[in-house]
Amino acid sequence: HGGMCDAFRQSIDWQFLTGGQWVSHPNGIHDYKVNITKKDDPIMEGIEDFDYYSEQYYMHVDPLNEVLATTTFKGNEVWKLEQEPGSSSGDAYTTEWLKGVEMPVAWKRRIGKGKIFYISLGHFAHELNHPQMNKIYKRGLLWASR
């Protein structure tokens, strides 16, 4: 569900490798802004802040990540409590405590000679058609592969 950062939840080594662990996506799919934080990085070069429509991830993130882009929660997202894991029933409430929380959506890191790139954008394949997201995705993968 959270892709690379939601795999192998029981593996601390994996979490240290990827630099984050997916927690949730309050409000499901909705509009939010992506803010470019490292405009001078080759992955982000020429990309300005942009609006995005998808799941806005809340994650536990390693402070050693080199954050390339973030999103900020508005605090009006709706969070639905699961009465049982995987259940769609439960109480819903507004996430006021998240107001102003800045969450990384793209980062890179190095471990030894290895390079790791992560982007939380792209819940559906058609999101790769979003011009800014597509550039970040491609450039990040190229950076990690060299």
Could you say what each language-model-derived stretch is?
Residues H1-A7, K113:
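Short alpha-beta junction capping motif
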Residues C5-Q21:
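Extended active-site neighborhood of metal-dependent phosphoesterases/phosphodiesterases
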Residues Q10, K39, I43, M133-Y137:
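Stable alpha-helical elements in mature extracytoplasmic
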Residues G20-G112:
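Catalytic beta-strand/loop cores that center a nucleophilic Ser/Cys/Thr
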Residues I119:
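Phosphate-centric recognition/catalysis
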Residues G122:
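Catalytic cores of NTP-dependent nucleotidyl/adenyl transfer enzymes across multiple folds
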Residues A125-N134:
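A short acidic/glycine-rich loop-to-helix N-cap element
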Residues R139-R146:
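C-terminal alpha-helix
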